[in-house]
């Protein structure tokens, strides 16, 4: 069972101008004391076509965390507009909140984000080059997509050091019929849990 349960994420300052910081009020509960930090990240998906446009807007370490209920406001600057493809500036994209423990992601919360011009004239005749000062960001706060992953909460430093010192041959664990591809790192086994907070 997961030792951390995310109880609520409130989207603050929404809708807002595109250049405003993202703000999320995160409430979570620890079932027992966690001796190491939780790492929270806010990731802006710049393009659905490629992960190369994803931007980690901020990362924060919280911990060690005592058992009980906790709340904090996680704020991150708006994405770097120079890294967003012009064709993806206006329209729907995604912002992700992730949390890891000992380097293992155990929850991913995704929100759809609609970036649009507030001026009706700009909506009808958008400029060729996006004008980010005129864009409004609206996060669909009512319908987050939540994915949970099983992780090893009990990993000890000795076990982690041992695993770092092993140099396995590439694909040594794969049957001949398996081709390497994109998959979660070992130890992150999705429990096929997608639901709303």
Swiss-Prot record:
Its main location: nucleus. It holds the Pfam family ASF1_hist_chap. It is found in: Nucleus. One of its GO terms (molecular function) is histone binding. Keywords: Chaperone, Chromatin regulator, Nucleus, Transcription, Transcription regulation. Signal peptide: none annotated. Interacts with histone H3 and histone H4. Belongs to the ASF1 family. This is Histone chaperone asf1b-B.
